[in-house]
Amino acid sequence: MLLRILTFLAVCQVTTSHKILMFSPTASKSHMISQGRIADELANAGHEVVNFEPDFLNLTDKFVPCKKCRRWPVTGLNNYKFKKIQNGLSGDVFQQSSIWSKIFNTDSDPYQDEYTNMCEEMVTNKELIEKLKKEKFDAYFGEQIHLCGMGLAHLIGIKHRFWIASCTMSVSMRDSLGIPTPSSLIPFMSTLDATPAPFWQRAKNFVLQMAHIRDEYRDVVLTNDMFKKNFGSDFPCVEFLAKTSDLIFVSTDELLEIQAPTLSNVVHIGGLGLSSEGGGLDEKFVKIMEKGKGVILFSLGTIANTTNLPPTIMENLMKITQKFKDYEFIIKVDKFDRRSFDLAEGLSNVLVVDWVPQTAVLAHPRLKAFITHAGYNSLMESAYAGVPVILIPFMFDQPRNGRSVERKGWGILRDRFQLIKDPDAIEGAIKEILVNPTYQEKANRLKKLMRSKPQSASERLVKMTNWVLENDGVEELQYEGKHMDFFTFYNLDIIITAASIPVLIFIVLRISNISIITSSPKNKKD
């Protein structure tokens, strides 16, 4: 018996358990999935994880984001306007806007405004705040989408904060942290511009980055004003709370990123949970995966609702499938999109579904390509499975994700408007993926690199979290640049002074010259 006890103790990892608050509003299923993976990994490591779920889209009773955490839904929020804005995103992506409208648009962001309104409704709920305080959380985890959670963490007395980038870090997040974002190398997240780029594209990229920082600053000011109004003028700036987080976890993989400057306390954890996910396929999917020369999967994620997209898109897509009758197509649409189901009637090589076991389908050896919106969860799953992709970005970070994939050679990038105006371009991309083995070779290499890393995403997350909490923070990793103002950080005061000196010299010489001329003997005689 003693030998058994000693053996058991030998194989157990001694870890101090901490109570962690995971701030995970139901603003998007894909974000809830990403947050849920982090929560489960921390719970598996022995921590008590509470998944705090303000119900922005009435999803808490319809979707389970984590298996090992304790869920804490917050229902009854006034979310009507937020849901309306979210549902309208799909239709808005096909409204073209010029660069000038983005630069000179000083209107408020309805999405962020409603997020702030629901945040205020929640943090001013005294009963809820008291319950949260009694939990005595050791750490807070929250995304970059909105800084409500940072203010909440401070309000309930959480000392250690971990800031999560749910996708590639935006220029505004990088700016908050004091990380340079070279506009000559890194394309603005919502454009398809290539880099390195000619002069005018770099100029456009730079101006769009500055406009984005301006817009994000406006949203931060709005959130700050809300907290100060309710909790006093000495309430700290939520951006300061965010940028002084102990660690920044980025839910991406460095191998998929456009390489850029970074910091020692920025840790990539892309790929969490992928090795344990996948599972089996039910009979319906097993049958279709065995048909024809292979299978092509089409999905635009959870935000781009196919019901609200222009009808021409699905019509053109169905026509494209008939150009490849030797291949089977699995097309995932919104469950209310009855029109797409009707369009597929009579097409023997097309299966339209409102749900697909995506990781399992991607892992199947007969899947030939994935037509995707370039959302980061989908890209991670594709890369981990070694599947070439055709990227049709719609919004947010998706265009930059697509550009990164194209640059690394395992996918083909297309413009979303080609779904309407130039379906031949989509057809051509499918042909290229099927006949050119280079894309599969690049995807296989990426798969090998991701799976053979010296340290897994799970190990990075757990070990770095434990390291911070067991040492009561790691101030030594805090970057001094994040405390500097804009002028000092970029040495603008020095540049302006240096640029002013020649001008001052010119003015002095000019005045001196005029003075000499006017005081000459000839002028005196006159």
Curated annotation (Swiss-Prot):
Enzyme class, spelled out: transferase
Coiled-coil intervals: none
InterPro entries given in the database record: UDP-glycosyltransferase, UDP_glucos_trans, UDP_glycos_trans_CS
Pfam families, alphabetized: UDPGT (PF00201)
SUPFAM superfamilies: UDP-Glycosyltransferase/glycogen phosphorylase
A cellular component annotation (GO) from this entry: membrane
Top-rank lineage group of the source organism: Eukaryota
Membrane topology: Single-pass membrane protein
Compartments, as annotated in UniProt: Membrane
Reactions catalysed, as given in the entry: glucuronate acceptor + UDP-alpha-D-glucuronate = acceptor beta-D-glucuronoside + UDP + H(+)
GO molecular function terms noted in the UniProt entry: calmodulin binding; glucuronosyltransferase activity; UDP-glycosyltransferase activity
Xref: CDD domains: GT1_Gtf-like
Signal sequence region: 1-17
Keywords, in A-Z order: Calmodulin-binding, Glycoprotein, Glycosyltransferase, Membrane, Signal, Transferase, Transmembrane, Transmembrane helix
Glycan attachment sites: N58, N305, N513
EC number assigned by the record: 2.4.1.17
Transmembrane segments: 489-509
Principal location class: membrane
Subunit and partners: Interacts with cmd-1 in the presence of Ca(2+).
Similarity comment: Belongs to the UDP-glycosyltransferase family.
Name the UniProt record assigns to this protein: Putative UDP-glucuronosyltransferase ugt-48
Organism, scientific name: Caenorhabditis elegans
